[in-house]
Each structure stands twice: as structure tokens, then as C-alpha cells.
Amino acid sequence: MVCGGFSCSKNCLCALNLLYTLVSLLLIGIAAWGIGFGLISSLRVVGVVIAVGIFLFLIALVGLIGAVKHHQVLLFFYMIILLLVFIVQFSVSCACLALNREQQGQLLEVGWNNTASARNDIQRNLNCCGFRNYNPNDTCPASCAKSNQKCSSCAPIIGEYAGEVLRFVGGIGLFFSFTEILGVWLTYRYRNQKDPRANPSAFL
């Protein structure tokens, strides 16, 4: 049977949703591992990662059930949700790749000022204090501050990695964006194909 047939479309759609399921479980596992080993203390960051993982898992589950049962309603909603996710993810990925150093610095400073727990994690792990300037009167968990040594600011250190991280995130996001649009196309195609084992007089 050619790859455009019913069975091939079904198998491809199932494989794609199994991939999404593995990615979602990986996200949830990484978040739990990070907070369990004390690498991440920000409940907000962990909550967002886990929420994204659960959302992706639910989408994959809907797509998998719809593909296995050739369920028209589930496949329709799966296709619409996947299209919306593609639009958002593609836009965010392009934005990550398009940000220049000045814009990266502005975003990092906003995030720095709004997340106290993540800020403490960064200062402790990178052994730096303050974003651009360090005030000795401020509390800093870095080892340099505890030993009364001179502490460097965190902005230059974070800036070295920010561009690489954004390019990595943008590239991964673009990859999954194209898998999502592939999923939309496969779902649309699969919905309009007739199961060869079904009743010939039945509708799809």
C-alpha cells in the first residue's frame, strides 16, 4: 500500500502523537527532577513547564485516540488545537531567533526583577550578585558574597549564554512547529479517508 493510504496515514499520526507523548513526559520529568534535586526553586518556572507538559500530553492523547478509532470529532478538535499551537509556537520561535543583544538584555532584566527565587538560583549557581550592579546591602546567596570576596554582576555572564539558549529554543521550536503543521495535514487527510475495513455504506 502506498504511503498516502489509510493505514499509512493512521500509523504516521499515531507515531507523531507518541513522539508528543514522550516529549510531554520528558518535560514533566525534567521539572520534577530539577525541583527534587534543588536545581530549580522557582515554583512558577516548574509550574509552567509541568503545565506545558500536561497540555502537550492531553493533545497527544486526543490525537492518539482519534487516530486509532478514526473518530471524526476528536480528529477535528485535535486538528484545530494543533493549528493554534503551531501559530503560537512558530511566532515565539521566530521571535527567539530575531532578538538582538539589546532586546535580550531588556527581557533578561525584566525577568530578573520579577522572579526572586529564580534570581537567587542564578546568583548561587553562577556565583554572581546583582544584575548590572551589586549593592553590598542586598542579600546574595552566592559564595563570593558569603566569603566577602568581590562579586561580579550577573548580566555579562547570563548574556554569554542567552543568545545560545534563544537560538537553541528557537530552533527546537521551529522543528516542532513543522511537525505540528505536518500533524494538521495528516489529520485533515486521514479524516477524509475511508477505513477499508468499515461498512462500505457507512459515512467515512
Curated annotation (Swiss-Prot):
Membrane topology note: Multi-pass membrane protein
An example Gene Ontology biological process: regulation of calcium ion transmembrane transport
Membrane topology, Cytoplasmic segments: 1-19, 66-72, 189-204
Pfam families: Tetraspanin
Transmembrane domains' residue ranges: 20-40, 45-65, 73-93, 168-188
InterPro entries in alphabetical order: Tetraspanin/Peripherin (IPR018499), Tetraspanin_animals (IPR000301), Tetraspanin_EC2_sf (IPR008952)
Disulfide bridges in this chain: none
Keywords of the record: Glycoprotein, Membrane, Phosphoprotein, Transmembrane, Transmembrane helix
Cellular component GO terms held in the UniProt record: plasma membrane
Location of this chain's protein in the cell: Membrane
Keyword Cell membrane set for record: no
UniProt-recorded name of the protein: Tetraspanin-13
Organism: Rattus norvegicus (Rat)
Gene: Tspan13
